[in-house]
Amino acid sequence: MESPSAPPHRWCIPWQRLLLTASLLTFWNPPTTAKLTIESTPFNVAEGKEVLLLVHNLPQHLFGYSWYKGERVDGNRQIIGYVIGTQQATPGPAYSGREIIYPNASLLIQNIIQNDTGFYTLHVIKSDLVNEEATGQFRVYPELPKPSISSNNSKPVEDKDAVAFTCEPETQDATYLWWVNNQSLPVSPRLQLSNGNRTLTLFNVTRNDTASYKCETQNPVSARRSDSVILNVLYGPDAPTISPLNTSYRSGENLNLSCHAASNPPAQYSWFVNGTFQQSTQELFIPNITVNNSGSYTCQAHNSDTGLNRTTVTTITVYAEPPKPFITSNNSNPVEDEDAVALTCEPEIQNTTYLWWVNNQSLPVSPRLQLSNDNRTLTLLSVTRNDVGPYECGIQNELSVDHSDPVILNVLYGPDDPTISPSYTYYRPGVNLSLSCHAASNPPAQYSWLIDGNIQQHTQELFISNITEKNSGLYTCQANNSASGHSRTTVKTITVSAELPKPSISSNNSKPVEDKDAVAFTCEPEAQNTTYLWWVNGQSLPVSPRLQLSNGNRTLTLFNVTRNDARAYVCGIQNSVSANRSDPVTLDVLYGPDTPIISPPDSSYLSGANLNLSCHSASNPSPQYSWRINGIPQQHTQVLFIAKITPNNNGTYACFVSNLATGRNNSIVKSITVSASGTSPGLSAGATVGIMIGVLVGVALI
């Protein structure tokens, strides 16, 4: 409250503070028409504080005024009276010594108590002895103490108990509020407020209800919060978890198992092996385990406060260290395409998985590879040289895979047809002849040379120096494999001549189809130190992406041949002493049939005339022809002749062509109109001249 600007009466009521600001003076001389009112400042007052009953619109020319406790003027309830003329204040029966009256009639009450609550009446006496009254009021509230929370259950059990929190103390005219983790109460069917919100009940408490709870009390003059209360919910134990999750161990390892179960208070643990109690610890340690330590391991968790027990069982398997595997074979030297081989993974062990690898890869899918029921034996049927391996087998248990050393299969094969090099067959006198023979074989082949059927030597190479024309002949290389018992020979014709022979042209395709086939011409023979040349129609080869030379220009390839490639091809060979050309070879390109042409072009005729139609289509070989009139087969000729035609011969005339060599067909349709004698054979809408061209693929020629 602010101090007044005008002093109270002189009698012994000390000034304690100013209650009215300078603006209050404006109310001392209000207009006489305004109604007298009292304003309580503040309206809600805390115990021990003060309140000012502020007078508004006080009338002029007053004799005095008095304050009363209550809503009416009662001498027994007078607090104080004031005479303006003498400026004297007189206390009444209800005066407590805490009241101060001011010349403007306002009343200050200090050190407010609960009994001060209520109405106060100001009685004003004017100079003309006319009275006027006004009533004001205020309410007194206590200053709230700091609340606290009490609980009916300090250790509730999860999913079983309910907890009732009560905000203390119980205070009249107070509002109660609750917070959980400093947040307003969540909406939940398990939370219930009662007793004017003073009691918070949690039904079927869970571990998630373990939170910070606070209550608050409020009234119009104060608000206080309690200290936090943490709810201690007893729960568990949950189903224990045994770690690590590994259930397979090698013999000789240490077994170290740990058990954990969510629980409040923390659980007590016990271990059982195959149903036999071991120890009451959270961890179980067994050093240097053996196969005998295999079994079921049970962890039991117990909560003495909740009275609950939970168990978890894990099965531990201890494996003996397996030996390193190795591979045995029933045939150490199998013959290609004759023998089968059975590879067996040793040793035989129970409860073991057998695995196989070939060339460090898993076994390919092949009808020639067969595994036994237990996968321990791998059988290769009709072995080939590609089956040499290496092969590995493995034995696998829950812990590891052990590999054998690799085994290489020694497949006996060959000899294949020998190859004689170099490939030259033509030599000049005076040079050295050096021939080498090679045949794929295991073990390596033994070689022999024969000339014109006569044994020369048992070596892989044949060398003859300073050859003459007498050295011309048949040179045979014979390869022998004593292990497989097989022999193979290759014969090569060697010609020794000072002059180059007349070359010839060979072809890989004597009748290529246009726009489909490629043709490779090769100039024969292959001769040492020889240059090969080509001509087409007596001219050097044109530049074309469809023409390609290879094999030292000895081979000429024509890609996607066309009918224009049907020319005369000549090859030539030359060396330092001679040159020669082949006879020309004409390429026979099969093509067509193209779209046929019907002649003459006339389509209108007079009745009585002869109709003579001829059909022609470019094709190699020449095509076969057939005719149809209005879709009806007629004859298989190139020319269609009808004497003395009539209007009945009107219609569509189709010529079909077919090339059996290329497998292609084609056709053309022509409309023929025959007019009666004496009429003009002009073109009408019904006799429009037109040629409808189309390829009728798959139409059978009749």
Swiss-Prot record:
Is Transit peptide given among the entry's keywords?
no
Q: What name appears for this protein in its UniProt entry? A: Cell adhesion molecule CEACAM5
Gene3D superfamilies linked to this entry: Immunoglobulins
Q: Per UniProt, what does mutating residue 133 to A do?
A: Abolishes dimerization
| Cysteines paired by S-S bonds | 167-215, 259-299, 345-393, 437-477, 523-571, 615-655
* Impact when changing residue 129 to A/C: No effect on dimerization. Reduced affinity for E.coli Dr adhesins
Q: Give the transmembrane ranges.
A: none
Among the GO biological process terms of this entry, one is: homotypic cell-cell adhesion
Oligomer status and interactors = Homodimer.
Could you tell me the keywords of this UniProt record? Apoptosis, Cell adhesion, Cell membrane, Disulfide bond, Glycoprotein, GPI-anchor, Immunoglobulin domain, Lipoprotein, Membrane, Oncogene, Repeat, Signal
Task: Provide the free-text tissue specificity comment from this protein's UniProt record.
Answer: Expressed in columnar epithelial and goblet cells of the colon (at protein level). Found in adenocarcinomas of endodermally derived digestive system epithelium and fetal colon.
Q: How does it sit in the membrane?
A: Lipid-anchor; GPI-anchor
Q: Which residues form the propeptide?
A: 686-702
PTM annotation = Complex immunoreactive glycoprotein with a MW of 180 kDa comprising 60% carbohydrate.
Where the record annotates domain Ig-like C2-type, the positions are 145-232, 240-315, 323-410, 418-495, 501-588, 593-675
* Positions where lipid (GPI-anchor amidated alanine) attaches: 685
UniProt-annotated glycosylation sites, renumbered to this chain: 104, 115, 152, 182, 197, 204, 208, 246, 256, 274, 288, 292, 309, 330, 351, 360, 375, 432, 466, 480, 508, 529, 553, 560, 580, 612, 650, 665
Q: Name one Pfam family in it.
A: V-set
Gene Ontology MF annotations: GPI anchor binding; identical protein binding; protein homodimerization activity
The text of the family note is:
Belongs to the immunoglobulin superfamily. CEA family.
